[in-house]
């Protein structure tokens, strides 16, 4: 009896000592324990998703892929699979399972290794939310105490729901919703028992038990899960026997991107990071942009096709690599495909290896092991590239270009395969809605994988003649009209700073004598623009450009500004052209229409300032002081004094502008009105002439009229010195678009090509705005305006139409006439008088008409 008594006393003491030790340990680490109450309002890390305007997914950013699901959305069989595998006594314990611990310890003792885990689902939840993955005794103790706390705070169903959404299941998939999508391309409710068992087997070792890493291990682990489900009575013997014989059909499924717009998506990502920091990638934001599939894909296709066409006409630079030489042993298929799989794809360009070649045809293997045939049709373009200005002879047979062992690039053209190459030239396109600034399409380069540099918004490039419409607008605001006569003859002026004559020339170097301003813009006459610049004053012109949103620091105050020496981005140029297209309003480009949180609540909605040419909104700069000299249509070239320039450039009247920004309803804000609506109409009309010309002459943008077959469009070419940059910018109904093409290496120019009879409809000659950039503009605008009714240019109030003489710009007095638009009060009042010959006054200092 004494032994029993002492034993009981000892047992009680041990219990008290153990309890006291546990309590003391708890009190010691309690301050270090996180507050589990946060689980009540936990926010799971959900990636940011970016959508098009019509709700299609275009990008996803975030380290963790997660698709949150509620417990009632998860099939009961999947819940049971996890419980059977991870914590069979889940509904019986209070966070820690002593029975499970004893069982795991016993197995470890008798087997010599730990084959069973002792952590409950609640402990795993505590570890995943609050603790580091380190394996230490202190971490395990904290895990136990946290699990007990969690059980006191949450119901079993709440714990399960959090666990099944939080657990890591491999391949960046967190939670069963993401795992179902990643491995099987399904939602959880579409999974079979076989697939549920595969996913339920992943928590123990997601990197090695997943079927993408090792199918054998995945099958073995699935069978373990099925066995435990059978032991727990969750499935029948028949289900077990049938399911364990089924194959696992798993593949990696990336997020279901409807279409790609990588440059714009990256702009959205940067904007979201600037607003929300790292939480942008974790809080499940859904961002809706302003682009649509049809328009964006038309832009990408137009840019890529145009870049490839340019690249092809300049010749083939040879294979990307030589894998084995002719005469050497060919590589086996596995080695070829492994090498090709390691290479990127660029848009439509796929890496390939030439496995055989004869004069009529070559065979090339792709990364997936399939082969394609390259006939003479697909390699005929591949004249040897010698320089940007010189190409070799057209190949006569396939083996003039291709040999076995070469690593090349190919692309599909219709049903055929063509030889290709990664282009060295690059391009950008920006398209916006001129009424409110919404970005309709944006392409920052040939391919985002090739270069992430966004040329649409980051590349400052000289704009060439793309600047002329803005400068002519300034000149007309100063007193010129579309009928003003300017002398198209060569200029030669001494430049003291350079120590030489400055001799701007037309391109091509053809001169027509006195011509109207409309023709000067339509034919992009450089010397005519220089004369207009001198007439209105360089400083005035430079400051006027700021009305169109161009940064002052990028504008030079020299006469070379007339030839486009200023550098702007395609986005800035498109914004400027929108002013001319929308009646004179400076809209702000924007690309995010709405941001939702993970619950679908709208936390941001764009409210852009819009153009309203029919509204009575004053120009924020007030009235420009007119020059009496410019208003006189019959004077020689003049240079306005610096004093007159300065006083004639009004500054924005901010108070008036702020009043003008609020509509009569008080709900809609207007964009700043920077040039008056009649003036915007005049330059818009002149841009139309750049495409359609007049009887007797053709505009530099004439190809757009041929390609689009509609007359409600306008635009302007742009080419810089040595053709380093080429542009085409213009408008159509409800759209303004700017296209640039050039080399990132400023030392290279676009060059020229000789015609090859082997290539159908090939562009040849010197590259420039009309040949190098406009084809992309035409192709894009044709796609965007398909089905859009033609909208004739309608003069706004304040515009009068007068019949003028083409040769003098005065009132018509015979058959050589056309109708011309004028701002009311600026129309000519004198009848045209035709004289024999043209007099150019020369007093030793090159004095000419304007």
Swiss-Prot record:
Please give the superkingdom of this protein's source: Bacteria
Is the keyword Nucleotide-binding assigned to this protein?
Answer: no
Mapped to this chain, the residue ranges on the Cytoplasmic side of the membrane are 1-5
Query: InterPro entries in the record, alphabetically?
Result: Beta-lactam/transpept-like (IPR012338), Glyco_trans_51 (IPR001264), Glycosyltr_51/Transpeptidase (IPR050396), Lysozyme-like_dom_sf (IPR023346), PBP_transglycosylase (IPR036950), PCB_OB (IPR031376), PCN-bd_Tpept (IPR001460)
Q: Which residues form a coiled coil?
A: none
State the UniProt keywords alphabetically: Antibiotic resistance, Carboxypeptidase, Cell inner membrane, Cell membrane, Cell shape, Cell wall biogenesis/degradation, Glycosyltransferase, Hydrolase, Membrane, Multifunctional enzyme, Peptidoglycan synthesis, Protease, Signal-anchor, Transferase, Transmembrane, Transmembrane helix
The pathway where this protein functions is: Cell wall biogenesis; peptidoglycan biosynthesis
**Spans traversing the lipid bilayer:** 6-26
Q: Where is this region: Transpeptidase?
A: 400-710
Q: Which Gene3D superfamilies match?
A: Biosynthetic peptidoglycan transglycosylase-like, DD-peptidase/beta-lactamase superfamily
Q: Where is the active site?
A: 86 (proton donor), 465 (acyl-ester intermediate)
EC numbers on record: 2.4.99.28, 3.4.16.4
Family statement drawn from the similarity comment of this UniProt entry: In the N-terminal section; belongs to the glycosyltransferase 51 family. In the C-terminal section; belongs to the transpeptidase family.
NCBIfam families with a match to the protein in the record: PBP_1a_fam, PRK11636.1
Q: Which PANTHER family match?
A: BINDING PROTEIN TRANSPEPTIDASE, PUTATIVE-RELATED, PENICILLIN-BINDING PROTEIN 1A
What does this chain do?
A: Cell wall formation. Synthesis of cross-linked peptidoglycan from the lipid intermediates. The enzyme has a penicillin-insensitive transglycosylase N-terminal domain (formation of linear glycan strands) and a penicillin-sensitive transpeptidase C-terminal domain (cross-linking of the peptide subunits).
Q: What is this protein called?
A: Penicillin-binding protein 1A
Task: State the organism of origin.
Answer: Escherichia coli (strain K12)
